[in-house]
UniProtKB/Swiss-Prot annotation:
Main localization category: membrane
Originating organism: Shewanella sp. (strain ANA-3)
HAMAP family: ATP_synth_gamma_bact
Location within or outside the cell: Cell inner membrane
Molecular function terms, GO-annotated: ATP binding; proton-transporting ATP synthase activity, rotational mechanism
Domain of life (superkingdom): Bacteria
Record-stated family: Belongs to the ATPase gamma chain family.
Tagged with keyword DNA repair: no
Protein name: ATP synthase gamma chain
A single cellular component GO annotation: plasma membrane
The protein's assembly and partners: F-type ATPases have 2 components, CF(1) - the catalytic core - and CF(0) - the membrane proton channel. CF(1) has five subunits: alpha(3), beta(3), gamma(1), delta(1), epsilon(1). CF(0) has three main subunits: a, b and c.
Topology of the protein relative to the lipid bilayer: Peripheral membrane protein
Length: 286
């Protein structure tokens, strides 16, 4: 059994760690609330944009935009949104597993693939995973701006426009609630048709003055908005996962302190008993 002094030092060390994890939990909780507010503010726009584009994809257009045409998938692109920092449980690992599984299914169909990782952890993973990394972004912070993403997204859009990509997906952790964050893969291009009940009441839009000029701008803006929403959702998921992970670490530290305190008490009691035995033995000898 370790000495009482050694155990006491270990208890002090665990207590210091507990203070750090507790502080990180509170910081993550505060950041999560702000991230949720940003996510809630941008979600209606992203969902409305998705709905409008879904109807556009269903409509009978005189001008057929390349983003509406479905072609054979020979090369697939992924914009993968992960975190810049760790200490957020299995958030990134679960996301990467989902991407790897999807890549495997496309690989079996003979398709090639390339990646656009967003977030330092995503960049690190896909540079070692294999496959072409066409563009990447990291260090976006807790309050990213669309302008920070446009350059990276445009690289993938240009590849699609040039026929180097036949499918484009965005992958991120969708924020469900504080305890649940789900990795999702959403198709960006070709534009997915709306699965809404409103499709039953189908209509066409009238484009003024020119459908080509409008759609060229609108569809690019749609892709950018969906990627931005994915980044915002992922930040909220990151802070929620970190808060839960740090709470678990704080609780585990408390349990470990209790266990060490018990061991310390036993060691101290054994030392006192030993001293008493020696005193009694010495007195008997006299």
């Amino acid at each position: 059994m370790a000495g009482a002094k050694e155990i006491k030092t270990k208890i002090a060390s665990v207590k210091n760690t507990q203070k750090i994890t507790s502080a990180m939990e509170m910081v993550a909780a505060s950041k999560m609330r702000r991230a949720q507010e940003r996510m809630a503010a941008s979600r209606p726009y992203a969902e409305s944009m998705r709905k409008v584009i879904g109807h556009v994809a269903q409509g009978s257009l005189e001008y057929k935009h390349p983003y509406l045409e479905v072609r054979e998938a020979k090369r697939v692109g992924y914009i993968v949104v992960a975190t810049d920092r760790g200490l957020c449980g299995g958030l990134n690992v679960n996301l990467f597993k989902k991407v790897v599984s999807d890549v495997k299914s496309w690989k079996e169909q003979g398709a090639e693939f390339e990646f656009c990782p967003i977030g330092a952890r995503s960049v690190q993973f896909f540079k070692s995973f294999g496959g072409q990394v066409s563009a990447h972004a990291s260090g976006l912070g807790d309050a990213p701006k669309l302008a920070d993403l446009i350059g990276t997204v445009r690289v993938m859009l240009d590849a699609y426009n040039e026929g180097k990509l036949d499918r484009l997906y965005v992958v991120f952790n969708k924020f469900v609630n504080t305890m649940t964050q789900t990795p999702v893969i959403e198709q960006l291009l070709p534009l997915p048709k709306s699965e809404d009940d409103e499709v039953a009441h189908r209509w066409d839009y009238i484009y003024e003055p020119d459908p080509k000029a409008l759609l060229d701008t609108l569809l690019v803006r749609y892709v950018e908005s969906q990627v931005y929403q994915g980044v915002v959702e992922n930040i909220a998921s990151e802070q929620a996962a970190r808060m839960v992970a740090m709470k678990a670490a704080t609780d585990n530290a408390g349990t470990l302190i209790d266990d060490l305190q018990l061991v310390y008490n036993k060691a101290r009691q054994a030392a006192i008993t030993q001293e008493l035995s020696e005193i009694v033995s010495g007195a008997s000898a006299v």
